[in-house]
Amino acid sequence: MPLTPPALAVFDLETTGVDVATARIVTAYVGVMGVDGSLVASRSWLADPGVEIPAGAAAIHGVTTERARAEGRPAATVVREIVDELASRSADGLPLVVYNAPYDLTLLKHEAKRHHAGPFVPPPV
């Protein structure tokens, strides 16, 4: 049990591109912050998106196609885990902070549909 009560959850994605309908998740992060700003819990993912990661995207987040294939987990597994993690944080009553929420949450919705990860219902942002 954390010593600091959780206050909010944070979420971020790095992807293969900018089109929310076609880009794929490469990395994801969910953190839980305490009321004092401390990190209470965190979880991160590296996915093999199943497609080539363009050089421009790799230059931004540092993950190449080769690394994703060698070290990443299957995209369908990663997407299901992200959706489950966000649902859990929402069930905890935590508001979600997302730097570029329209992009990240819409892309996750498309990925959830693509990988049959159940309906993704974004939590309060």
Description of each model-found segment:
Residues 125:
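Class I SAM-dependent methyltransferase SAM-binding "motif I" and its flanking Rossmann-like core
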Residues 1-122:
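Conserved non-catalytic scaffold segment of RNase H-like nuclease domains
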